[in-house]
Design a protein with these regions (language model features):
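Residues lining hydrophobic/aromatic ligand-binding pockets adjacent to catalytic sites
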Residues: 21-147
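Polybasic, lysine-rich low-complexity intrinsically disordered segments
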Residues: 7-8
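Serine residues within intrinsically disordered or low-complexity segments
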Residues: 14-16, 27
Length: 147
């Protein structure tokens, strides 16, 4: 499939990324995107899944066009408050969040079902596009080959 490659901002996915596919060991994560909830919905977003525990501040439900809100995939409130979007805590946040995700089989199964049907966009509300739970969730799924 001759498609131009693009670079990803996710450290675990430092290989080139093709739209819809990650080259090499990550090829099982098909059609999975990450997008800030405040960005305009696009026709090719597929199923839009909010993975935050709290609804994005100031964003109306009609404007967000969220198809599924998987609060159970969000970090626990204590972990979210501890992390406080501090990049210095990113590595430890990801470790702790992965431990929480290990116990969330039902929510992972719901996400898996959506991904198997086609394109999925994980939505987050944090202002930092590189240090947020959607990026950590995507990396977790890639490492565990869960989707």
């Amino acid at each position: 499939m001759p498609v131009a490659a693009q670079k990803t901002d996710i450290p675990e996915l430092s290989t080139s990324v093709l739209p819809g596919y990650v080259i090499g060991a990550m090829s099982f994560i098909k059609h999975l995107r990450i997008k800030r909830a405040y960005e305009e919905p696009a026709h090719d977003d597929g199923v839009r899944i909010l993975v935050d525990r709290l609804w994005p501040r100031g964003l109306s439900k009609p404007r967000a066009r969220v198809d599924l809100w998987l609060k159970d995939l969000a970090p626990s409130s204590p972990l979210r408050r501890w992390f406080n979007h501090d990049p210095a805590r990113w590595a430890e946040f990801r470790r702790r969040y992965a431990r929480e995700l290990d116990a969330k089989d039902r929510a992972i199964a719901a996400l898996r079902g959506a991904v198997r049907r086609g394109r999925v966009t994980l939505l987050f509300s944090a202002s930092d596009p590189e240090h947020n739970n959607a990026v950590a969730l995507h990396a977790y799924l890639a490492r565990r080959r869960t989707v």
